[in-house]
UniProtKB/Swiss-Prot annotation:
It comes from Aeropyrum pernix (strain ATCC 700893 / DSM 11879 / JCM 9820 / NBRC 100138 / K1). HAMAP family: eIF_2_beta. PANTHER family: EUKARYOTIC TRANSLATION INITIATION FACTOR (PTHR23001), EUKARYOTIC TRANSLATION INITIATION FACTOR 2 SUBUNIT 2 (PTHR23001:SF3). It comes from the Archaea. Heterotrimer composed of an alpha, a beta and a gamma chain. GO terms for molecular function: translation initiation factor activity. eIF-2 functions in the early steps of protein synthesis by forming a ternary complex with GTP and initiator tRNA. This is Translation initiation factor 2 subunit beta. Belongs to the eIF-2-beta/eIF-5 family.
Length: 148
């Protein structure tokens, strides 16, 4: 009798559907690879400055630290910027259009958020000494990216 219980257990472990179901329970759900959109930047121009009012929301949608995204925009636009944590706004010391900000945010997403292997946005940006690595939570791929 004990032999038949072991045989049933062994057969269950070899069943493809059972193993697949067990695997899906262990793998975290992914956001998907469909077209993912970040919030449209709410821009106000004050003199020679540009204020992105919903910058914190944009950074949260990108799943990245707002200071990191701010540093990227600062570098790409070759200007000084300050992030106000209390209000969640980014102040750029240059006049820039919504279209240009959107283009740089899309480029940031392509380079530092979206997995180049599977297209998922379920990624983490890891810093290893002086290098940055983009690690995908969906497929497990690791890709070096240029430092910000």
């Amino acid at each position: 009798m004990s032999g038949s219980v072991l045989d049933e257990e062994a057969e269950k472990l070899m069943d493809y559907d059972y193993l697949l179901e067990k695997l899906y329970k262990k793998v975290p759900p992914k956001s998907g690879t469909s077209e993912y959109r970040i919030p449209e930047p709410q821009i106000i121009r004050i003199g020679s400055q540009t204020v992105i009012r919903n910058f914190r929301e944009i950074a949260q949608a990108l799943k990245r630290d707002p200071k990191l995204v701010a540093r990227y925009l600062q570098k790409e636009l070759a200007t000084a910027a300050s992030y106000e944590e209390e209000s969640g706004q980014l102040i750029l010391n240059v006049k820039v259009s919504r279209k240009v900000v959107n283009q740089f945010l899309q480029l940031f997403m392509k380079t530092y958020v979206r997995c180049p292997t599977c297209g998922s946005i379920d990624t983490k940006l890891l810093r290893q000494e002086r290098a940055y690595m983009l690690k995908c939570e969906a497929c497990g791929a690791e890709q070096p990216v240029k430092p910000i």
